Amino acid sequence: MGVTKKPDLSDPILRAKLAKGMGHNYYGEPAWPNDLLYIFPVVILGTIACTVGLAVLEPSMIGEPANPFATPLEILPEWYFFPVFQILRTVPNKLLGVLLMAAVPAGLLTVPFLENVNKFQNPFRRPVATTVFLIGTVVALWLGIGAALPIDKSLTLGLF
C-alpha cells in the first residue's frame, strides 16, 4: 500500500501556484528541481537498465565471420539504401544518378513553398502535399523492391 500526497486545494498559496499552470506539477510544486532532479533520472536509468537487461538476456547473433577471400555474387546494401542503390544501378550516367539523388531532398524542400497558402491539416484539403507524398511513397517502394531483384527484372519488378 502506498501513501499518496493529496493536494490541499483550500490553501490559497497552492491555488495561486496551480493557477500559474506551466512549470508546476499537480501538487503545485515547481518543475525545477523536483521533477528534473528526482523523476527524470529514475526514468532515464530505468530505460538504460531495461536496454542492458535485454541485451544481456537476449543477445543477438552477429552472423558468420567475414571471409576476405570470398566475394558474394551480388553485393546489396542495407534495406534502407535500396531505392538509392536502384537509382545508381539503373541510370547509365553516374553523375545523373547522383543528381537524381540530390533532387529528392531538394524537391521535398520546395513542397512547403508550393502550398504555403493552404493552412489546412486535413490531407484531402492539401492536394499538392498529398500527391507528392503518395507518388514519393510508390516510387520509393518500386525502387526498393526492384533493387532486391536481378538487374534485368529490376525496372519491371518481373511483372511484364
Curated annotation (Swiss-Prot):
It is a multi-pass membrane protein. GO terms for molecular function: electron transporter, transferring electrons within cytochrome b6/f complex of photosystem II activity; electron transporter, transferring electrons within the cyclic electron transport pathway of photosynthesis activity; oxidoreductase activity. One of its GO terms (biological process) is photosynthetic electron transport chain. Keywords: Chloroplast, Electron transport, Membrane, Photosynthesis, Plastid, Thylakoid, Transmembrane, Transmembrane helix, Transport. Its main location: plastid. GO terms for cellular component: chloroplast thylakoid membrane. The chain crosses the membrane at residues 36-56, 95-115, 131-151. Disulfide bonds: none annotated. Pfam families: Cytochrom_B_C (PF00032). PROSITE patterns: CYTB_CTER (PS51003). It is found in: Plastid, Chloroplast thylakoid membrane. Component of the cytochrome b6-f complex, which mediates electron transfer between photosystem II (PSII) and photosystem I (PSI), cyclic electron flow around PSI, and state transitions. Belongs to the cytochrome b family. PetD subfamily. The 4 large subunits of the cytochrome b6-f complex are cytochrome b6, subunit IV (17 kDa polypeptide, petD), cytochrome f and the Rieske protein, while the 4 small subunits are petG, petL, petM and petN. The complex functions as a dimer. This is Cytochrome b6-f complex subunit 4. It comes from Marchantia polymorpha (Common liverwort). The gene is petD.
